[in-house]
Every structure is written in C-alpha cells, then in structure tokens.
Amino acid sequence: MENNVIKDGFVSFLGYKTYYRIVNPCGKKVPLVICHGGPGSTHNSYEVLDDMAFKEDRPIVRYDQLGCGLSSLSSPHTYLWNKETWMDELNNLREKLGLKKIHLRGHSWGGRLALLYLLDRKPDGVLSVTLSSTLSSASLWKEETHHLLSYLPSYEKEALLKAEEAMDFSSLEYHNAYEHYYHLFIGGPF
C-alpha cells in the first residue's frame, strides 16, 4: 500500500509508547478500532482487513497493546499487564488520536478487553462492538485448557504449569511444550 494511505506512529502512555497504524486515515465513515488477541499478540494479523478500509471509506485503527509488538515493553514492570492498564491505554489511544466515535472489534483476548472496556468504563462514542473468537468465561477457558494438558507428556505439562505459576515464559522447556500444545490443540505448527 502507498504511504499516503497509511499513518502510523506512537502515542505516549505511562512513560511508554503505544504503536498504532491507521489504514485510510482520511476515510469519511466512523473508524474501526481493533483490539488484538493475546495478551501478547500484535496488530499484524489484521492486515487482511486493510482493503475493507477503502471499500467502506472507513479508517481502520490497529494498535499494539503495551508490552506487545512495536509498543514499549514494560518488563520488568509486569505489574502493568492487567485489564486496568489496557483499558486506560485504549482510552488514551482514543484521546490522543481524536477518536470520539468508533466501532470496536476485539479478537480473542481483545474481545475480552472490548467487553471489559464497555462494561467497566461505559465509554461514550462506541457505536458498535464486534467480537471474534472471544471466550465467554475466563475461568471455564482456564479449566478447559488445563484439561488439555492431561494429553501432553508429563514433562511438557510440568513446564507449562511451572511457567504459568512463576509468570516466567522464557525457558526453552516452556517454548517447546507450548509449541507442541499449539500444534495439537490450536492450529497446527507455527
């Protein structure tokens, strides 16, 4: 795509930077803001929606949540990785980019974020919300994903549970176990 139809940059947030990318920034219709999955994913996988920005004459705003993609990493400040921070970040993005009216789309974790934002913050100007592959219950999701661990070899199950308990996902054992889990239960090889 031509550079004149894409605007990207950073907005400041809590001393960090939130990366954003707007496709068709001069579109005439109300912008669509996309909250990505994860936590830990990025805005990149939503490029498939770029053509829609022009077909509908609508700006599409994608951004990387704090600690993800091109946004500042807050490690070792992982205490910032919580729903309040991410809701504040979405508010901040809207304010800094002048997004008074929006349509909001959330995928996976981004759908949870969108729901929390709507229910907890009751923001003005959200005209619609679209949820995609969003879990309805975090406790049920955790229960079911932990049930799937029983199908893994014990050393992989232990590596995944140890990482989750310690909130440390850096070990090779974790990455190998997660890759196997992903292959079996989510969508094939990386």
Question: What residue spans do the PLM features occupy?
Answer:
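Active-site loop/oxyanion-hole signature of alpha/beta-hydrolase fold enzymes
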Residues: 62-109, 113
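N-terminal cap/lid segment of alpha/beta-hydrolase-fold proteins
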Residues: 1-17
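Flexible "cap/lid" loop of the alpha/beta hydrolase fold
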Residues: 127-168
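Alpha/beta-hydrolase
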Residues: 161-190
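Conserved HGGG/HGGXW glycine-rich cap/lid loop of the alpha/beta-hydrolase fold
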Residues: 14-79, 93
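Flexible, active-site-proximal loop/turn residues at the rims of small-molecule/cofactor binding pockets
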Residues: 48, 77, 108, 135-136, ...
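Active-site acidic short loop of glycosyltransferases
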Residues: 27-29, 95-101, 123
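Conserved hydrolase catalytic core segment
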Residues: 100-144
